[in-house]
Swiss-Prot record:
Catalytic activity: RNA(n) + a ribonucleoside 5'-triphosphate = RNA(n+1) + diphosphate
GO CC entries: DNA-directed RNA polymerase complex
Keyword Calcium: no
Subunit note: The RNAP catalytic core consists of 2 alpha, 1 beta, 1 beta' and 1 omega subunit. When a sigma factor is associated with the core the holoenzyme is formed, which can initiate transcription.
UniProt-listed InterPro entries: DNA-dir_RNA_pol_bsu_ext_1_sf, DNA-dir_RNA_pol_bsu_external_1, DNA-dir_RNA_pol_su2, DNA-dir_RNAP_su2_dom, DNA-dir_RNAP_su2_hyb_sf, RNA_pol_bsu_bac, RNA_pol_bsu_CS, RNA_pol_bsu_protrusion
GO biological process: DNA-templated transcription
Alphabetical UniProt keywords: DNA-directed RNA polymerase, Nucleotidyltransferase, Transcription, Transferase
Protein's recorded name: DNA-directed RNA polymerase subunit beta
Organism whose genome encodes this protein: Campylobacter fetus subsp. fetus (strain 82-40)
GO molecular function: DNA binding; DNA-directed RNA polymerase activity; ribonucleoside binding
Gene3D superfamilies assigned to the protein according to its UniProt record, in alphabetical order: 2.40.50.100, 2.40.50.150, 3.90.1100.10, DNA-directed RNA polymerase, beta subunit, external 1 domain, DNA-directed RNA polymerase, subunit 2, domain 6, RNA polymerase alpha subunit dimerisation domain, RNA polymerase Rpb2, domain 2
Broad enzyme group: transferase
Amino acid sequence: MLNSLYSGNRLRVDFSNVAKEIDVPNLLQLQKKSFDHFLNLDNSQTESGIEKVFKSIFPIHDPQNRLTLEYVSSEISKPRYTVRECMERGLTYCVNLKIKIRLIVHDRDEKTSEKVGVKDIKEQEIFVREIPLMTDRISFIINGVERVVVNQLHRSPGVIFKEEESPTVVNKLIYTAQIIPDRGSWLYFEYDTKDVLYVRINKRRKVPITILFRALGYKKQDIVKLFYPIQTLNIKNNKFLTMFNPDDFSGRVDYDIKDEDGNILHQAGKRLTKKKADKLIEDGLKFVEYPIEVLVNRYLASPVIDKESGEVIYDTLTQLDENKLAKIVAEQNSIEIANDLASGVDDAIINSFLQDYETLKLLKQTEGLEDENDLAAIRIYKVMRPGEPVVKEAARTFVNDLFFNPERYDLTKVGRMKMNHKLGLSVPEYVTVLTNEDIIKTAKYLIKVKNGQGYIDDRDHLGNRRIRSIGELLANELHLGFVKMQKAIRDKFTSLSNNVDELMPYDLVNPKMITTTIMEFFTGGQLSQFMDQTNPLSEVTHKRRLSALGEGGLVKERAGFEVRDVHPTHYGRICPVETPEGQNIGLINTLSTYAKVNDLGFVESPYRRVIDGKVTNEIVYLTATQEEGHIIAPASTVLDANDIIKEDLIEVRRDGEMLLAKREDVTLIDLCSGMVMGVAASLIPFLEHDDANRALMGSNMQRQAVPLLRSTAPIVGTGMEAIVARDAWEAIKAKRGGVIEKVDNRNIFILGEDENGPYIDQYTMEKNLRTNQNTTFSQHPIVKKGDMVKSGQIIADGSSMEKGELAIGKNALIAFMPWNGYNYEDAIVMSERMIRADAFTSVHIYEKEIEARELKDGVEEITRDIPNMKEEDLMHLDESGIVKIGTHIKPGMILVGKVSPKGEVKPTPEERLLRAIFGEKAGHVVNKSLYAGASLEGVVIDVKIFTKKGYEKDARSFKAYEDEKNILEKEHHDRLLMLDREEMLRVTALLSKNPLESELEIGKNSYKKGDKIKRSDLDNVNRFTLNTYVKCFSKEIQKTYEDMKAYFQNEKKKLKDEHDAKLEILEKDDILPSGVVKLVKVYLATKRKLKVGDKMAGRHGNKGIVSNIVPDVDMPYLPNGRTVDIVLNPLGVPSRMNIGQILESHLGLVGMKLGEQIEEIFENKKAEWIKELRAKMTEIADVSRLMDAKAILSKIDDDKLIDYARDWASGVRFATPIFEGVKADEFKKLFEMAKIDMDGKTELYDGRTGSKMAERVNVGCMYMLKLHHLVDEKVHARSTGPYSLVTQQPVGGKALSGGQRFGEMEVWALEAYGAAHTLREMLTVKSDDVEGRLAAYKALTRGENVPSTGIPETFFVLTNELKSLALDVEIYDEEENNE
């Protein structure tokens, strides 16, 4: 059982009902596993993704049989720069791919041009540069920007059968089948309204299906025998006789059953029972008469041949009539007909033959061919490539290449598996092209479906949709790049002259095509996205996202309701809650918490196996297809002590349907109740009490919570907080266990011991980094020197983390009550105390950059010498013209000074005079400095300067280089010291464990032969003395010691090489885009306190805007004098139906009150107070169901217990997993322990008057988040600014410095008030009256009255549009009209 009182590095009381059998799988394993397999980083025995791509393209043959280009092997280099260096320098974190290519030059026969031998073999290594490499964070750094490749949820390759309503005929269903490959032509089979079966290739014109079969080489007679049961009719006494088969008479009999003599054995219209049929067979009935009226209009299955001449009288598929039948009776003994009346078949194939007859007849005349198979191939060629001339050989090759050529067509292993499963085939899985059998079986199954014997597929079933993760997506892109390269190589082959002996592989292969294709995917692909780094949760969920969009996926404008809807197969696989609001709803989803993706890309869900009503501990992961037919009980099913289901009848699921079943019939049970939801939804406590719409908002808004200055984990959690922190890269986890040796601001060192002896591991923490969303990222240690840590334990928190748990907000004391109308419409009233305490303060880092470029008139210069600037405006710049670190920046201040050369113009005498006085420079340069924007205020925390090779570095660059070098030197020194310490520990451990071979004296202690030296005697001995001591040990120990020395010598050499490589990168000239000579990046940290207008939310979709920040003395207060922190509107609860927030506030209040009781014990510190503390904590923890709290807490030592109790003093932490929340009786017990009234309400007093509130108020503790919709980034004003080019109206939006839209409804408001002058002003001078606004501006600047308005530009736009419709529009003014 994995349920534990521990959560991260703290204790949390867990209320789970069901014992946890397995831990939540690593949340990011899908992407890592997929990419590692692509580059074979997992060293698996199976063929890697990149190898498959190479083998699908190579070898490439010369059409003239002179050359062959083969792939030999590939190798991946190490990345040149670290992740951090790539982000700072704007580079791509990548590796180079080294491909070994072999060129074989063949000897040819001069006459036949056939290969007769090998003339020469040449091998060469070719570099494919910049293959992006996945970082440890499961992201990619592309041009300095961190990106994520989202998993694609797409249609699985294979065969799918559908039915749709006919668009032309009412109440008619059209049946279709599709064979969908991963690469190649799609094949569609479809019935039309007249029940003719057609086929389409790639949505081109349809052709009768028989054309395709003929093109595949089948004769008419073969096709008929494939699709129809053949009925043989013997002719005797001018009658047609057929074998008596009871299966032909299922249902009511259509005609009298007569024996050979004409005796009626069974009348028409009556049902032929099995008993009666058996009786007839017993009585010796073999043949029955086949009536001529049933035979008329039937079709021959084989030709009727004249016995004497051997001529064909009637060909296959001749329609029979009475005259033909009379002739047949006279001349033949028997005939074969296609039995289209048999069960499960219809006349679709016969109708297709009738349709293709005219087509082939016409082609016979135009092409001059008789062979119908060749004509069918030509017909398909003409449909696919209309207008192109064709010969029969080319047509046959074309048809073969469409479906049977591995280079052009690939079903993949998945598609083959789906085909075999659906059609009952046994084709080997390595055959990933179509076979004739595939096509025939698909057509047969479609006919069965049409005739009620097959099953329609559900395209939204997760058995028909699969996940393409990063490895597969990259392999597809790489394949596209190689296909382009393959085409270019083949073109080069054809253009080569006869002299091919001197040719090398590099002359043929152009790797740029591959690099370009891959970089296009990463920079412009729909699935490669700018990573959401607002907080650790947003990052984790972004990497777990499934998108139905992207190349080969759906288009959101055309996606219907069905594909977006929640499907029964999503249960435990795809989260039904977490999806965006808006036009992407249902198209972008998230994996459920416990879901895994198998090697074929299908999502699996975990279940426990049930045998005869007993729940076993065997856990199975099943795909949606494997789950079919299973009877599955929910996790909430009541079990007895022996894990046997208690109830005889229980509610279960089978194939998405809810039904009652006996316990003996149950085959599986859900692993846990929460497995149905995704990570973000699993973080919402009491989710089961929230409306689905609000749960959706809640899970989405948690991803928007900004990291606060001091985040705290929720008092009321769900247990998922520690799981998210465990798998997010932001936290540092110990790779190996041990004791904390040293902790400082930057590093943590862990000393441990394994089978090889002692070791020291170093972990480096990141500080004040900017994320993609401009939030701050810093890591801080949560361990201290001397602490014991286990492998995998979190030793340093990232942003939005506390004690190894996710912490995206603050616990606040809230009251549900109106407060003077300030919390109308979900507005939030906040206490000033929260702002003073920096409770919701966040730090944001902004990056500003400026480039100095090479221009035709000269080079731009970063300088402090800026024309027309006062000295006081430049005081904060250094001598290089760059802002100093630590400067407090205000809007409008210069960050980096830059001057740009003006074009050379002949100076006027005045300018010559100015130049003579003020120097040469001032005249012909212009100020192009980088200024702080209107809303930008903060402190400069870092500056990065990059200079191109060949250009002089400034003093600031040299200083930055020295600082960086000193940091590297210090790091290197620290690591060497730790390596020395590790070496000494290993040596002392070795010497203290083994006996001496001769006598030895250490200080005052003397040791005899066979003694073991005390470790304490060796601790203070230096390295050189140890060398002499080693000689007193056996040869084996001496050899081990020498090996150890050599190992550490090698490690030091590696450290030195690594350090030298870093210094080399530091000293190298920076890589900058062409034309850029210098790049300066300035980083500013801005402190954003909570303000009126900021958006806040709880975890239940209860969002609102801060409307008022009230002095804490005016806020409502409790009887003990404590003021509430936040006042929320009670009307926000009933209509939104998110009752979870009420329950959360109740449990949060319990946590706070119990915390106060623990704090009281700390304050009083009576005798044996630690014992009292332990007893109190045990009493609280005993409320949970599955934990033996007493056993756990009794094992914790006093110091650790005090640490945990201090944490609980600020609020006892609870975990209430989703669907397993705290029950009513447990709430009562907790309320009694916390001494809270049973209604959960309390008396409140008005802070302003001191009077008691009329009603008791629901006061509790709720976890509140500050979202990244900050008012500081939204407030915007404009006086004048840019105008739209066509309409001449002000543009919109803050980014463009736009105006406020005065829309149609606002115009109505002014019309209603009769404010005519204001209205005219709004629609003219303040909008698009170009002359009027210019005149108004002049009048205002001169202090004159504003003149009358003119005609708005919109009027002219309208008249021009009318003119474009060929309408003559003339404008008359009033005076002309009067005349």
